[in-house]
Amino acid sequence: MTGRLHLRRRPLLVALASLGFGPASAGPRRFRVALANLDETPGTTLEGLGFTGAELRLSFELAARTLPLDMLYFDNAGDPARAIANAEAAIAARVDLLIEYNADADANAEIARRLATAGIPALALVDPLPGACLYGPDNLAAGRIAGRALGAFARDNWPDEDVLGVIIGDLSANGPAISERVAGITEGVHATLPGLRFALLDTGGQSVRADGLLTKFLQVERGRRLLIATLDDLSAVYARNAIDMNRRQSDCVIVSQGLDRNIHGGVSEKKEIDPNNRGSVVLGSVAYFMDRYGYDVLPLAMRLLAGETVPPRTVTRHVLVTATNVFREYPPFDMN
């Protein structure tokens, strides 16, 4: 009798378990992952664009909410020595993985050596870390997207007219990122307009100077159509101001790099790119999505922690965002 009762109870136990009753499941293993961010100093932006370290960190905080991760955060503050100290602190905290964002190659080599000694894997953001998979932008490709957009605009709207290219931004910045973007822009334009010449206006890292520099240029270059590529979105805003003040809206067009809040506006009412503002001289901006890095990088981290093979380099999805697709890429409400 006891045996029959036991057999009868088994289907009931199975049914209860299927409804969530019964012994608690241990759940998935949780991992400790550290992000050592490049620089979270207020007012400091990343990679010559308009994104801040705080925005990048927030994307990791939000993306981690649905993953079995316990996150630790470090601010390298743009200091190689501090980056090494932060890596040592992550090792002492016995993290399962370090996500390192540091621009100094010597410091990265030392960080990689210490991580290897501790047996801790790493993911690198933007700048290579020896032995680590890399996630970051493809600056040359992003530049080409802008250049092709400008070339196509001139072909479709200004055929057989006198056209000149203008590149505005921090042209003297250290590192390869700016030079790669400039090379991509020129290649992209020349795919449509092989003989186009470019004027270079260097803001020296001060986007506000784009207004005055372009104003002087517009006063000299009259009677020409101008294809303007700005290397950051705030420079695009100031360039647009110069065009408006000089009443040159009919013969200037701008494509920028970044797609930060200066251009897409987020949830605010002030938007440079807007379906209701299709007459703007700002045609669009090439997206870098640095404010969404967490959503792309943490899945890579989970794959590494699961023992999967991850490509040596994963590049950001770059896309030209205009008034026609801005609400698809950055809806006018808080996505988080």
Segments predicted by a language model, with ranges:
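N-terminal export signals
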Residues: 4-5, 11-26
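Hinge/cleft segment of the Venus flytrap/periplasmic-binding protein
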Residues: 29-30, 169, 189, 288-336
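Hinge/beta->alpha junction and helix N-cap segments in small-molecule ligand-binding domains
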Residues: 36-56, 73-82, 104, 136-145, ...
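Signal peptide-proximal N-terminal region
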Residues: 57-72, 191
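Hydrophobic alpha-helical
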Residues: 88, 97-116, 185, 203-266
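Flexible loop/hinge segments that line or gate small-molecule binding clefts
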Residues: 106-141, 261-273, 278
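A conserved helix-loop-strand patch within extracytoplasmic ligand-binding domains
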Residues: 138-168
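Extracellular/periplasmic periplasmic-binding protein-like sensory domains
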Residues: 182, 186-199, 226-227, 231, ...
